[in-house]
Amino acid sequence: MANTPSARKAVRKVAARTQVNKARRSRVRTFMRKFDDALAGGDKASAEIAFKNFEPEIMRAVSKGVFHKNTAARKVSRLAKRLKALSV
């Protein structure tokens, strides 16, 4: 339980940031899901578009501190690998 006014404010700020981060993480997952759906459909063009939309979105989340940069790099790398396998 927060006892001081500054601690109470910190609790409020954490709750607000949690909501923002949750929304940003959800947005990244949505873009990833769109890529997966395009990949499952076998449509290379739509998969490339979905990948190009996904990459800046996850990097934006990295810059906001939602994901670690290595986590984002790993996800982008794995999706790029799957996209390349589709074209081969």
From Swiss-Prot:
Organism lineage: Bacteria, Pseudomonadati, Pseudomonadota, Alphaproteobacteria, Hyphomicrobiales
Entry keywords, A to Z: Ribonucleoprotein, Ribosomal protein, RNA-binding, rRNA-binding
Entry similarity comment: Belongs to the bacterial ribosomal protein bS20 family.
Described function: Binds directly to 16S ribosomal RNA.
Signal peptide limits: none
TM segment ranges: none
Keyword set includes Lipoprotein: no
Gene Ontology biological-process entries: translation
Native source species: Bartonella tribocorum (strain CIP 105476 / IBS 506)
Identification of the protein by name: Small ribosomal subunit protein bS20
Stored Pfam families: Ribosomal_S20p
A GO MF label: small ribosomal subunit rRNA binding
GO CC aspect terms: small ribosomal subunit
Superkingdom, taxonomy of origin: Bacteria
